């Protein structure tokens, strides 16, 4: 069963690509037609490829590994933050810092610094320093929080990236590819699909299109995590029965 309906994709404007003169020829297999100088994405292919991507993300999420949501453009940032938070996943919605993946140990130091300042605010340290020092530390924490807040709880590299607008997030793409981290992405008609492992041909500019796709990814993660918990609970419930059966078998011997 598909995760999407063709009608909802049409309503969200998923099919609207960029001006034909701005296209990437490598997107030709995913384009249905040109209308009034604008490329129209083949939604039948989007349906199939989106399902493939979501099934793969489901498998990753069930392992307990994290999927990083990335989208820093104006139309995407609030959606990325809200849906990633709902799914309990790390996210980047303000600015991608160079080395966020390839130099993760240094990024972790910045996160520890941010958390250290936060502790100072609650453990009484702020009461022992000057007003100027408090202000400087508060500003430092605010800046770090704005950029790193979405990955504050991330302790290791993500198992995959889900990206909105691969042209804008080219640094994230480059870092993930260098580390062999799978990339799932909405890919518009002006982008190179060969940069991505799981292509979802879609309008990456319209808010409703972004919302539809990002929500679907978050829903997939939430459901996969819930299934994992359910399976673990069932396994724990079955364990005593297995132990009892083994004990009975040993006694019979």
UniProtKB/Swiss-Prot annotation:
| Record keyword Ribonucleoprotein present | yes
One of the entry's Gene Ontology molecular-function terms is: structural constituent of ribosome
| UniProt entry keywords in alphabetical sequence | Ribonucleoprotein, Ribosomal protein
Entry annotated with the keyword Methyltransferase = no
Q: Which domain of life is it from?
A: Bacteria
InterPro entries of this UniProt entry? Ribosomal_uS2 (IPR001865), Ribosomal_uS2_bac/mit/plastid (IPR005706), Ribosomal_uS2_CS (IPR018130), Ribosomal_uS2_flav_dom_sf (IPR023591)
Q: Which GO terms describe its biological process?
A: translation
Any one GO CC term of the record: cytosolic small ribosomal subunit
Q: HAMAP family attached here?
A: Ribosomal_uS2_B
The entry's family comment says: Belongs to the universal ribosomal protein uS2 family.
- Report the protein name in the record: Small ribosomal subunit protein uS2
- Which organism's genome codes for this protein? Chlorobium luteolum (strain DSM 273 / BCRC 81028 / 2530)
């Amino acid at each position: 069963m598909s995760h999407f309906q063709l009608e909802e994709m049409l309503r969200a404007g998923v099919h609207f690509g960029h001006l034909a003169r701005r296209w990437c020829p490598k997107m030709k297999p995913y384009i249905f037609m040109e209308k009034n100088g604008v490329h129209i994405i083949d939604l039948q292919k989007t349906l199939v490829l989106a399902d493939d991507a979501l099934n793969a993300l489901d498998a990753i999420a069930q392992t307990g590994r994290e999927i990083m949501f990335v989208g820093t453009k104006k139309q995407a940032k609030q959606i990325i933050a809200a849906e990633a938070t709902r799914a309990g996943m790390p996210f980047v919605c303000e600015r991608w810092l160079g080395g966020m993946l390839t130099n993760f140990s240094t990024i972790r130091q910045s996160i520890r610094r941010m958390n250290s300042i936060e502790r100072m605010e609650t453990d009484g340290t702020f009461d022992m320093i000057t007003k100027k020092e408090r202000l400087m530390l508060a500003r430092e924490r605010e800046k770090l929080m704005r950029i790193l807040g979405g990955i504050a709880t991330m302790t290791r590299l993500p198992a995959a990236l889900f990206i909105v607008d691969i042209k804008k997030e080219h640094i994230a793409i480059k870092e993930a590819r260098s580390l062999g981290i799978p990339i799932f992405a909405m890919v518009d008609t002006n982008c190179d699909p060969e940069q991505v492992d799981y292509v979802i041909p879609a309008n990456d500019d319209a808010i409703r299109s972004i919302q539809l796709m990002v929500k679907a990814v978050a829903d997939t993660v939430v459901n996969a995590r819930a299934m994992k918990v359910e399976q673990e609970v069932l396994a724990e419930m079955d364990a005593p029965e297995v132990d009892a059966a083994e004990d009975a078998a040993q006694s019979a011997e």
